[in-house]
Structures are given as structure tokens and as C-alpha cells.
Amino acid sequence: MAPKISISLNPPYNGEFYSSNDQMSGIVSLQLTKALSIRKISVILKGFSETLTKIDQEYMFQQNGMMMPGQDNKSFHTLMKFEQRVFPPDNVWNALDGSSKPFKVKPGSYNYSFQFDKFPRKPECLKNHTAKTVAFVTRSNARLPPTFNSHWQEFNKIDNLDLYFYSFGKVIYMVQVQLELGKSSSWFKPFHKLIREIETFEFIPEPKDLIIEPDEDDNEELNAFSNNSRGNSMVTNNEFFNSSNLKVPSKDVKVVNGVGYIKSDRNFSQANSILIENGDIRSRPVSSVTSTRQSTRLVNGMKVFPSTYKMGLPDGESNMRIEVRSRDLKQIYRKDYLFRSGSQNFDKVYVVMEGNIASLSKMQITPLKLQLNLLETTTYLSQGIANGNYSSLKLIEIDLNQLKSNKPLLDLNEIRENFDGSMFECELRLKDHPILRKLVFNEEDYRHRGNRLYSFKTCTIKRTFSLQLLIEWGINGIRKQSEVNIDPVQIFCQVREHVEAEALPRYVPPPTYTEMAS
């Protein structure tokens, strides 16, 4: 009967996933029903990332009337690899002085413990990167990425094209025990027989090592465009998107016959395509192009995120837009409050209007419904070809008039004008809504397509998020919708660490002294 070997990993410090400060440790169990010749038993801790990208035949370029054949592009990066021998012990192994003579192990059960050092901060593959290596990160900002798509085999069992293409990028960490038998070598069996057992685990670095740093060169940032050949937007299985951004340096574009290209798969409703010709970057012409990047500005130390478009008002001359103002909306941790006062997320939302104040004060403007979506953009890169995947999670959808608060959410009696009187603003008090003020982000630690919610960027995989705030309005009986996009937003699956100030010691009056009579 063949030997049975298994791995038992000690649980992580937080009880959920391994992190940067953990030391991987555990026990290797070996059961033998008969004597066996064993040369050595090793435990290997390793991680790797793998991506596969495709080129759509529809967008292939022709050379002299000949269509270039399509091909798959694969990349494989070794993130880390450490090996530890658990049998035989070091003193015995050193005494062998290179001898390959095996050990005869009697039947029975054997346990071998192992422990590795803390996880490295940077991936091992950096030493193999050259000046021509195509990657999303540089040597200075590269960090060991979190586990991603470790259940990729399950995606192939689902008849869903989006999940199939989503599984083309993965980051997997594992502990592998390798038992090398001591069978004598011969000309027809030149290698020792190996028995392997693998145990995968989830690794997520500390938040400081997940932060996506902005690109060093703003010229490398390319706006994403909507390909309307299949419609402006598409909703499938409650997953949709409105905006995305693909950032790839121009030098990283695959060049074929003097023309370079980066292409997303056609199976997604939005395609990102860029051409490089004569050293210049230009967008691929499409039937209708809409920019999705919103400009932000600072007001009183807060970033202002305006709505993507202005809404015309019934008088034909006035218009209004929505502004979200925040100091810290670019990072959101799990269990952060989204609308509560002081959360610095959506607690300061304003309606900004332009027009005649007398006309504006007569209008009936009421917020009716609110929907907040989390938009995911995952980009895989391989051999200079990048494919984008897009999906959406609905965080909340609520009828704002279902529960009445003490004060109206929008009171036009509190409208005020700016310093030059050209615009007027009024606060939309979403923070006072009895449901919204209790809403926290990702309280249940949701797994989207098998992965926790976190942003990260590594050599060939980039996962970013943005927030989309949709509000439906009733304006003099006419329904209109506003949209605000916050892009990008750094998402963490960890709970924010609240540093509480140490309480001052209680005041104790000093003792009183009396002079003793001499």
C-alpha cells in the first residue's frame, strides 16, 4: 500500500487569512504500512502568479492583405519559493556528505514539524525583470500580492463566459510536501520517485503593502472609452459598469509590423483599445466615444467629486449637479461607515445649482431613490497584451421617502450662494437618513467571484475599484437621475485600526504634611 502523507497548517494569527507578520508553520504526517526507503522529505513554501490574455480576431491587423493568426499570451511569475528539509535531521544529512543512500523507515506514523520565516515584502520575480519587461509595477513599488482566484478551477465548471475570462489571472500560494523515495537509480529509471501533497492557503498582506501608488508619469494614463457597437451599457446577471481605466505605458504595447495594440476581449460590453503609430498614442476610432474620467478639485481642504453631467431644470435656463466632498474617500476599509456624519465618505453631499435664485426657489426638487454600486476593474497583462474584466456590486438600493426623518433630506430654504453669486448650493443630508447613517461597508466580508474585496497591483494583474452613486430625483414631477463616480477607490478587506488615545491617569491630590513638634 502506498504511503499516506498529509499537511496540517497552523491557523493564522487573525484566524482568517495569513498576513505579512505571520510565520507559516505546521506538521507533516506520514503513515507507512510497510517499510519504505526514503531519501528525504522536504516542505516547500511557494507562490506564483499566472496570466493569460487573448487577442480578438476582429481587431487583428493585416499585413499585405494577410490576416495575422491569433494566439494566446501567457506569463508566469514566481513570487516566492522557500524549501525546508524535515527528514533526515541536519546532523544526519551533513554526515552523509552528499551521499544519496536512502534510509529504511519502519512501518508506523510519523510527524514532522516545520516553520518558515515571515513572508517577504517584495516578489522574487523582480530579479528576473529587465528593462524591457512589461509590468504594471516598478521595482520600487512592487509588493507581494494577495491571493487571487485560488478557486479558478471552479470557474471552468460554470457556464458563464465572464467568469471564464475572469479566471485567466490568478495568484496562488501553497505549501507542498515532497517525499523523495530512495529507489536505486538505473539507466531506465534515472530519477528518484517523488510523492507530493499540496495545501493552498489564503495570503493577504498588511494594508500598507496593498496601497496602489499613482503612476509616475501622468502621460501613461489612458482614458477608457465605451465601445458602442454593442450599446452604451449592458446589464447581465445584475453585473454592469459605467467607467473603467486602463493604464499601460506606451513602451509596453505589443508591436506587430510597426503597429502596436492593447486590446480587451470582445465578450465584455466595454472594450479598451489603443493604437501606437509612429510613436504617438491615439484611441481606436469608435462610433461613439464618451470619456469617463471626472476632474476633481479642492474646496476648504476637501476633494470635490462632481457628477458626470449637469441636469437641466424646468425653467430651461437653470441646471443642477451633485458634488460629494470628502477628505478621505479614496480609501475605504471593511466596516467603515459610508454616510454617517464624520465618516469622511458620503456625509457631505451637496446640490449645486446655476440660474436665477427666484426661479430655483419655486421648484420642487426631491430625492426619490438612491443606489450605491462598487465597480470592479480587473486587468491582466501578458506579453504586452492587456485584457480588461468589469463587474459591479450593488451595495445598497433604497427608497429615500420610505422612512421619514425629522428634517427633509433636501431643504431649499437653506440654499446659499457662493462668493460671487454665480452658483447656489444646498446640502443633501444623507447622513440624517435613519438607514443610511447605519450602513457600513462590507460588514459580512463578502467574496466576489471567490475573492475578498481588496485592491492590489502586481506585475501582470491589477484590480481596482470605483464607487458609483446614483440618485433619482423628482423635479416638478419629472424624474431625472444623477451619477457621481469616485475613481479609483482603494478597498481593503481589513478593518480599520482605530488608534485610541491613552487615557490620562486620574488626578490624585498630593499628601499633606504637618510639622512635628520638636
Curated annotation (Swiss-Prot):
This is Arrestin-related trafficking adapter 10. It comes from the Eukaryota. It comes from Saccharomyces cerevisiae (strain ATCC 204508 / S288c). The lineage of its organism: Eukaryota, Fungi, Dikarya, Ascomycota, Saccharomycotina. Transmembrane segments: none annotated. Its main location: cytoplasm. CDD domains: ART10-like. It is found in: Cytoplasm. May regulate endocytosis by recruiting RSP5 ubiquitin ligase activity to specific plasma membrane proteins in response to extracellular stimuli. One of its GO terms (cellular component) is cytoplasm. Present with 736 molecules/cell in log phase SD medium. The keyword DNA-binding does not apply. Belongs to the ART10 family. Keywords: Cytoplasm, Endocytosis, Isopeptide bond, Ubl conjugation. GO terms for molecular function: protein-macromolecule adaptor activity; ubiquitin protein ligase binding. One of its GO terms (biological process) is ubiquitin-dependent endocytosis. There is a cross-link at residue 118 (Glycyl lysine isopeptide (Lys-Gly) (interchain with G-Cter in ubiquitin)). Ubiquitinated by RSP5.
